[in-house]
Amino acid sequence: MDQEAKDLLVRGAAQLGVELTSAQVGKFALFAAELRKWNRKINLTAITTEREIALKHFVDSLSLCRAVGKGGKLLDLGSGGGFPVIPFAILHPKSEVVSVDAVEKKIIFQRHMGRLLGLSCFQSIHARGEELAGRFAGHFDWIVSRAFSDIPTFVRMALPLLRPNGAIVAMKGQGGREEAETSRPALEVLGVEIRQVLEFPLPFSGDGRSLIVMGRKNES
């Protein structure tokens, strides 16, 4: 990334309450370079400029920290090119972080990035979310997704993998609150409640973002 993109990353993260070290910025720069290089051969993302990657991938991913605390075990369902899971792993390198996607080429890229960035606690799995229950039943404190599916479908897939008192977080755009409200009847059937809806603008772009935080009823 050029200096302008790095500055946007650092300042955007700071607006979200995240302070990045120079070493972390260096890892994000390497991630951006590899993402652009691999994207020429395989379709990982439609976001390709350094500025867009800094804001719409990296800063957007770091906004997850408004809902997810440090520590605990995190799963990203349908992680695509590695968002938000790899930025989260860069920020919290000692946390157990697991990424799952059904598209093998995206997982190959994620594993490459995990090795290159030295993310020893990061694991990337080629599978569908519903295939994880036998291996990871009740395992995760946090289960997240970014533009993966509708909320009820995501929650159905996440519930068997969630620890008691764990949280499910859907990262959505400006219409997140409306989607959450229309999802309430389906969530009620699943025994899940909406604990919090966090709405905020993405730094510098002003695009609306929402974090829908959910959990099992009677556990909050």
Curated annotation (Swiss-Prot):
InterPro entries: rRNA_ssu_MeTfrase_G (IPR003682), SAM-dependent_MTases_sf (IPR029063). One of its GO terms (cellular component) is cytosol. Its main location: cytoplasm. Its EC number is 2.1.1.170. Transmembrane segments: none annotated. PANTHER family: S-ADENOSYL-L-METHIONINE-DEPENDENT METHYLTRANSFERASES SUPERFAMILY PROTEIN. This is Ribosomal RNA small subunit methyltransferase G. It comes from Geobacter metallireducens (strain ATCC 53774 / DSM 7210 / GS-15).
